[in-house]
Amino acid sequence: MAAIGVHLGCTSACVAVYKDGRAGVVANDAGDRVTPAVVAYSENEEIVGLAAKQSRIRNISNTVMKVKQILGRSSNDPQAQKYIVESKCLVIEKNGKLRYEIDTGEETKLVNPEDVARLIFSKMKETAHSVLGSDANDVVITVPFDFGEKQKNALGEAARAAGFNVLRLIHEPSAALLAYGIGQDSPTGKSNILVFKLGGTSLSLSIMEVNSGIYRVLSTNTDDNIGGAHFTETLAQYLASEFQRSFKYDVRGNARAMMKLMNSAEVAKHSLSTLGSANCFLDSLYEGQDFDCNVSRARFELLCSPLFNKCIEAIRGLLDQSGFTADDINKVVLCGGSSRIPKLQQLIKDIFPAVELLNSIPPDEVIPIGAAIEAGILIGKENLLVEDSLMIECSARDILVKGVDESGASRFTVLFPSGTPLPARRQHTLQAPGSISSVCLELYESDGKNSAKEETKFAQVVLQDLDKKENGLRDILAVLTMKRDGSLHVTCTDQETGKCEAISIEVAS
């Protein structure tokens, strides 16, 4: 038996496998260890990965990118609204669900985001099967710490639709620590770890406490306005200004030309992590003009200095939020492809001069490797080289119940505050007027602001056909159990009659 770990990011996906006591990333059929999370639709086929990304210049309206940003979200979600505006592939609402409108010329069809994610997961499964064989389908999927229940459900369903047997969803910072065996090297000590993840579209920071081999998230913060794409965009804008200076053409309003510049800027950005300069050459960029521009690392660092500053400010802000100083952090784990940037690493090192910066595992591989290790633990590998982590996941958001008081007014109660160590169990007594024959327990989640208009409903339990009472209230006992993977089981019982209803909100099978 073997196990698989998959990280589906906003801009790329990566798969690692556990085999023979070790976990490692598998290269795809193009020889790349990271696959663009891009799907392109044509008349006769669906293209996934690098080929889809390369074809976007001529097929941009039928090319889906960053699908993770819209998974499990509705049209009134602010992040979904931002995505809809920015997406080059048209997104519409149909029967209350968001859909991509794909027009291949032969037909127009609607595609749901989960199906796009399914195709990417299928590509990851195919890649894993190239080394494990087709019988290996057990997988652990990574999720951002701030994903809500609907987002986690959508991601899990997409993986299952691709043919995976989803063992568990694991939070990304927990997977990163597991990849480095943190907590296993010194199982009796206590330490605080900063997980710095600079992905394609966002910066995610987490401070984790490791105590006697147990992981716990202390604080976390995500900024969707800083990511690798923003560094690429900054460099592409510079290239556009250089082209204008040389040829008097402003191509910033030309989508095709800017897409070419973005592609060139992305390649240059990657090169500048290891080289002192990078050459950007584009054949016939605009009006038949070729473009050749050399960019030094120093120039790139100067252009991106505002982005670097935002990253450093975010670290300092999280330390303040946690009541920590830099001296309280024992290690820093780097994740996400853009954390490779040397200038950024130096700035982080300046904050934590005495702290070990962990980057020996490629930053865009560390999270799927941790997921594969977790999968290996779950399927019971006897020769796994890392002990069972005893990892404690935490609830990422507040979980609340909505009830009513004697007057019938709404009342919200927080049962699982964000950061609650999992597994956890809570009881809540809901009082409802005896004159009604049905009672509905509504479950909400929030990012911690705790005001009713900030809450998002994700489930409900309904007790029906209750005997009416002439006077007074009836007591409904709700028992909520949240497992380590974030799945929630809720039982509601009428204390007088014993009538009971239950639901499970699963995030992994």
Curated annotation (Swiss-Prot):
The disulfide bonds in this chain are: none
Q: Which UniProt keywords apply?
A: ATP-binding, Chaperone, Cytoplasm, Nucleotide-binding
What the entry lists under CDD domains is as follows: ASKHA_NBD_HSP70_HSPA14
Write down the Pfam families for this protein, in alphabetical order: HSP70
Localization: Cytoplasm, Cytosol
Question: InterPro entries, alphabetically?
Answer: ATPase_NBD (IPR043129), Heat_shock_70_CS (IPR018181), HSP70_peptide-bd_sf (IPR029047), Hsp_70_fam (IPR013126), HSPA14_NBD (IPR042049)
Q: Cellular component per GO?
A: cytosol
GO molecular function terms here?
A: ATP binding; ATP-dependent protein folding chaperone
Signal sequence coordinates:
none
Q: Which domain of life is it from?
A: Eukaryota
**Assigned protein family:** Belongs to the heat shock protein 70 family.
* Stored PANTHER family: HEAT SHOCK PROTEIN 70KDA
* Stated role: Component of the ribosome-associated complex (RAC), a complex involved in folding or maintaining nascent polypeptides in a folding-competent state. In the RAC complex, binds to the nascent polypeptide chain, while DNAJC2 stimulates its ATPase activity.
This protein's name:
Heat shock 70 kDa protein 14
